[in-house]
């Protein structure tokens, strides 16, 4: 073999080595690309299924019942949202006034600390475990605008703060009160939108009287429950809080209560267990006013099976009107920095009958609402029992005829 042939062989060998090396590098690059694409695909699949699951089975802080105004959804044993109707009795909790306005101490503390850190965890658990948890939304959600001229106290909160309710298990709020119109028609409109956007149901105010006087309905296989919200405060001819009419937005105003009684009778005739939540009474006193004493028997006679009240900012007496329990005022649930007794009513309804009613005593103090300990609970029960002629609270808060 001459030198030229040997050189040609070496050149061919180098070409083969270069080609082989190139093939290895190319294969390595392709493998790297495939691995990267595969990893990205896995990540995308994980994100996709996470989003899908969060939108369909992520547990909310409450159990949905079937309602004519909400999805036909309940939770399964694991807390996932599944289609269907709730079996068995319905549990409801009721508490008094709450305020999200950050210009006041209570609202500022909620904004800075988080609502779950200003209310006793055991009280939050009661609301989250209930099928329906209700508070009085004592303010409008409003951005911009002007408060009612000449009104001493006016409130408003950011629309985003309506999401607070979801964190503590509240799924229905009452709007028939003397502050929901503090920022006028625009403020009320913003309030309805904010609550709707947050998925929080509401009663007692609307774009017209039909909406304001509309009941909220909850159904299980054994129960049909109707809840109404109304107010009789600001009894003068020119109230700061506008009553809704056929053409004007406002609250369900019942200083003259014939339409409220009609609505109770209508709901009762449809086969509902009717609950009425009133904004009534005189502020800062445990004494009932004449309108409370007049209206409670009328509402009960019209067919209400349970009546609860707010507005006085303090606890008032409990009584039975016939077989209808009346909690005249539940006080402030989380409203200001003052120390005050308060509480929560827990009602269980089965086969359209009230199975049990329990008062859970609590104390609002230093911008925290705590469940009362045994000693404080005994004191609050004794205080209420002294005022309440026909009703008595037992040691566990269960309400009984005296």
Residue ranges and their predicted role:
Residues 1-23:
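N-terminal targeting leaders characterized by basic, low-complexity, disordered sequences
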Residues 2-7, 28-402:
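Acidic, metal/ion-coordinating pockets
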């Amino acid at each position: 073999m001459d030198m030229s042939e040997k050189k040609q062989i070496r050149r061919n060998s180098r070409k083969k080595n270069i080609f082989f090396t190139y093939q290895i590098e190319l294969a390595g690059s392709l493998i790297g690309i495939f691995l990267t694409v595969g990893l990205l695909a896995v990540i995308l699949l994980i994100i996709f299924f996470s989003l899908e699951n969060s939108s369909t089975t992520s547990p909310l802080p409450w159990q949905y019942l079937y309602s004519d105004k909400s999805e036909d959804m309940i939770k399964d044993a694991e807390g996932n949202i599944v289609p269907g109707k709730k079996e068995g009795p319905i549990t409801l909790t009721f508490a008094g006034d709450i305020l999200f306005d950050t210009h006041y101490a209570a609202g500022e503390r909620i904004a800075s600390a988080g609502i779950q850190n200003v209310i006793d965890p055991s009280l939050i658990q009661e609301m989250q475990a209930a099928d329906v948890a209700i508070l009085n939304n004592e303010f409008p959600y409003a951005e911009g605008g002007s408060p009612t001229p000449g009104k001493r106290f006016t409130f408003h909160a950011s629309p985003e703060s309506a999401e607070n309710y979801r964190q503590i298990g509240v799924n229905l709020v009452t709007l028939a009160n003397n502050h929901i119109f503090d920022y006028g028609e625009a403020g009320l409109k913003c309030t309805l939108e904010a609550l709707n956007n947050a998925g929080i149901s509401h009663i007692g105010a609307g774009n017209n009287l039909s909406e304001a006087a509309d009941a909220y309905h909850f159904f299980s296989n054994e129960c049909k429950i109707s809840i109404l919200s109304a107010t009789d405060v600001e009894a003068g001819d020119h109230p700061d809080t506008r009553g809704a009419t056929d053409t004007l937005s406002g609250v369900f105003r019942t200083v003259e209560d014939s339409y409220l009684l009609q609505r109770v009778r209508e709901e009762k005739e449809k086969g509902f267990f009717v609950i009425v939540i009133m904004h009534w009474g005189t502020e800062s006193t445990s004494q009932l006013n004449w309108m409370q004493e007049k209206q409670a028997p009328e509402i009960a006679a019209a067919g209400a099976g349970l009546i609860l009240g707010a507005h006085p900012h303090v606890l008032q007496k409990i009584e039975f009107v016939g077989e209808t329990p009346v909690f005249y005022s539940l006080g402030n649930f989380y409203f200001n920095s003052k120390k005050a007794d308060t509480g929560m009513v827990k009602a269980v309804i089965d086969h359209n009958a009230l199975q049990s009613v329990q008062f859970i005593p609590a104390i609002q103090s230093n911008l925290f609402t705590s469940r009362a300990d045994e000693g404080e609970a005994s004191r609050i029960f004794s205080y209420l029992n002294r005022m309440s002629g026909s009703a008595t609270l037992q040691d566990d808060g269960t309400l009984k005829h005296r």
